[in-house]
Regions:
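Fold-level recognition of mixed alpha/beta catalytic cores in primary-metabolism enzymes, strongest
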Residues: 1-75
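Metal-dependent amide/peptide-bond hydrolase catalytic core
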Residues: 43-171
């Protein structure tokens, strides 16, 4: 019983009050950091016109349109890599994480859905960063019909300065 009492007191002392330090497992290459990137993630659906693959001219292949969108996103990701490149968190990033489209090899697909991951350095606004991506795709793929879902994640980057990140997270 005495051993249980000692353990109980130890646990209570560790869990009471605010911690002196918190460890968050981020991919930092074992470097100590005091901030981390935020993220905004959403799905975009590129629309086409379905038809039988023996008459592809009667449809609009959403996979071809989505391929152009993916290449535009790759181009923007390269531009983002140059922005804030000396930031302790590294540069902002943009990635297509998943792509789904088509229902059969003999059908021209009418839709393709891409899941977008835009990582933010502290100080970047999640929704403004999302808007930048949407606008870039619209400018570079003007003929594509694209529907953007609301973000399923929008989290500002965190910094040891805290105030800017907290304001961005509330908006």
């Amino acid at each position: 019983h005495e051993r249980d009492s000692v353990a109980k007191k130890l646990i209570q002392s560790v869990l009471s009050g605010r911690p002196d330090m918190v460890v968050v497992a981020e991919p930092t290459g074992l470097q100590l950091v005091t901030q981390h990137k935020g993220a905004v993630r959403w799905r975009m659906t590129v629309c086409g016109q379905a038809c039988h693959s023996s008459y592809p001219e009667k449809g609009l292949n959403a996979i071809y349109s989505a391929s152009r969108v993916a290449l535009a996103l790759e181009s923007l990701s390269q531009k983002l890599a140059l922005r804030h490149s000396s930031h302790p968190c590294g540069a902002p990033t943009l990635s297509v994480g998943t792509i789904h489209g088509g229902v059969g090899v003999n059908l021209v697909p009418d839709r393709v859905t891409l899941e977008i991951d835009r990582r933010l350095v502290p100080g970047e606004d999640p929704l403004a960063s999302r808007r930048e991506v949407i606008d870039y795709v619209s400018e570079n793929c003007p003929t594509a019909v694209i529907h953007h879902e609301d973000p399923f994640l929008a989290s500002a980057g965190l910094s040891n300065k805290g105030v800017g990140a907290a304001k961005a997270a509330k908006s």
